[in-house]
């Protein structure tokens, strides 16, 4: 039961705090980083830097730091809470974002009052179950974790008769962390998971204006891989609007993956030459092979460790197992295809989640659709394809070099 001084302190705290709870600290929870052993600090430092980058355009001032195995974000008095949370939800490596009430240690009676005020302000409906979970990293604190749990639970039950304890599946899990200061939180906003960008190298994404390739870039970057991208432009057959669409897609992906170096390759002359010299049922696969060659050139030049495509088995003629085998033959870098076993509906769901879908379906054709054959080969034979490419030997090296030389490179973020 509450004694008179406790009840008075709770009343004074409720009066002081009113009904306007604001959060000026976020506790950042991460997953796999916690099991990285001796290299853990490298992943933590990368995550801190990614958080700083994500918040740089958010209204307000933010201090991001790590201490005692935790990452915190301290916020200025006035900042955009919703925008800050949305930005943090795009940082790979974060599994949870906890809005925290940070308190100075003014004794246990004051902590009781603050906990009651927190529960009162956070939960209008008190017909819930709860559990208190205390962590005490400050070992000289006068109570141990079990005593803190029991005493704070008792004061909550006294203050709100309709609330009940459930230690197994509570509606509210009130976390109390006793450090130099005291941290209260009960909400965990989900993050995207994964690993911080750049902790697993860099790869080259073949980016088109379609639905699949932006999703492929997102999925690989989620594992800590930085992205560059190559886009094949075919003026005048593809418009400036088609090119801008791809730039816009790169910007959307960069919200998660960080700045993306985008190589825009003029592919028109190569496409026309292949169209003129090669069997039309093999156009798609031969053009695809030259796209891979050119993208790999830039990948190696910028020390990428692999290539990324949005291919899924059997989705179109160039994505059968035989076609992928023939396409791979021109590459020495590994080719990562994160969508390889996914249905189109699953890919669309991810594109909607990362906000690329509406841009991807804008009706501007890219070079892959302009020169498509009516009846493309679905089971290409590698020897036959190489034989057909011999028809290109007179001029293809010159056109390849010209495409490399005239590339337009921009950085989008």
Model segments located where?
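A glycine-rich phosphate-binding loop feature that marks nucleotide/adenosyl-phosphate handling sites
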Residues: 69, 265-270, 312, 365-373
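Conserved G/P- and acidic residue-centered "switch" motifs that form tight phosphate/ATP-binding loops
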Residues: 210
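RNA-binding accessory domains that recognize and position tRNA/RNA substrates
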Residues: 4-204, 214-260, 269, 301, ...
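Active-site adenylate/phosphate-handling loop in enzymes that bind or generate adenylated species
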Residues: 154-156, 193-200, 271-272, 276-354, ...
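Structural beta-sheet core signal
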Residues: 205, 229-231, 264, 309, ...
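The feature marks non-catalytic terminal segments
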Residues: 358, 362-413
